[in-house]
Amino acid sequence: QTVMRFGRLDALVNNASSFFATPLGEIQLSHWDDLVGTNVRAPLFLSQAAAGPLRKSEGAIVNVTDIHAERPMRNYVVYSIAKAALTGLTRSLARELAPDVRVNAVAPGPILWPEDDETFDEVSRQRIISHTPLKREGEPDDIARAVRFLLEDAPYVTGETINVDGGRSIAI
């Protein structure tokens, strides 16, 4: 529909995600299907559907992954696996779609906290922030700026992941 309406497709940002705890011993198939479905399956098939128009426009794809793709979070087994798979998908698509389409990822750190998850109470949040080199949480605009950079100002970058986490990934 986008191509029909605007005549072209320049970018795809795969940002949809499910996020909830899946401690080992409590994981159900429905958890797997939900987390892998939103974090890997949907980006794969959206990217595949967009590949033709993106090749024509020499566009770009940005996947929003997570720093916990590289450093798994305790009790979030399936989420961490799904984000690691999305990082792998980013690299695979970069190879498959080059040289016409660039594919990269942005990995947020502490930006928005889940409201309904007691894992991230105020004490936990402050502990995480205290272990973040920049000593603050990020803003959604920090992610948006990184995505925009990869879409508009990074013509020689593909297959890469930019951590936007205040340095947290070097401290955990």
Predicted regions and their residues:
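Active-site loop immediately N-terminal to the catalytic Tyr-X3-Lys motif
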Residues: G25, R71-V77, K135
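Active-site helix of classical SDR
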Residues: S47, A82, T90
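Alpha-helical segment proximal to the catalytic Tyr-Lys
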Residues: G52, A94-P99
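A conserved structural motif in NAD(P)-dependent oxidoreductases
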Residues: T132-I143
